[in-house]
């Protein structure tokens, strides 16, 4: 439909502009511009996966959700170093990344699994991404909890950050988990490790 409209616009503007009211010309030009913008966004998204580097060494930074799955993650992704802690917030990860960089132990691929313990804003998330650097591939795991009140408040900035940073990708744990209650323990938040670890491996491979 977009292509058809664009062709009509080009024909009208190129061959019949003298016969068209100025308002109609402006509307057609606006539609043509919107079509071009949509196409550019689609092209940018399509080209994004090709910018991924090989996985290489992997660092995973998370909270208690990742902590519970740490042994399974390390077994499933042997080159992965897991740094996870209960009640960890996004802003705390900035200092962790700084420390790992100073020790020259931050992986080529960084998995972030934070946001379960409270919402955060895009600015804080961007500070973390900037600290990790554009030369690394980042995967941010969306949060999920059957009774997690701020799930959307955490996932909205995660999705926004992936859109505005070419090296940031989403691991949609929330999307995958909603149809699989059997993946979780009784609290509806903490998960059975094997499913989580396998999702991480599949997403970064």
Which residues make up each language-model segment?
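N-terminal secretory targeting modules
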Residues: 1-59, 103-106, 165
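Glycine-centered structural positions embedded in regular secondary structure
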Residues: 14, 93-96, 197, 203
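Conserved SGNH/GDSL esterase-like catalytic core that processes O-acyl groups on lipids
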Residues: 51-127, 145-152, 156
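Hydrophobic/aromatic beta-strand patches that form the interior of the parallel beta-sheet core
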Residues: 59-61, 139, 169-171
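A short helix->loop->beta-strand "cap" motif at the edges of active sites that frequently abuts
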Residues: 134-137
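Catalytic His-Asp segment of secreted/periplasmic serine-dependent ester chemistry enzymes
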Residues: 151, 155-205
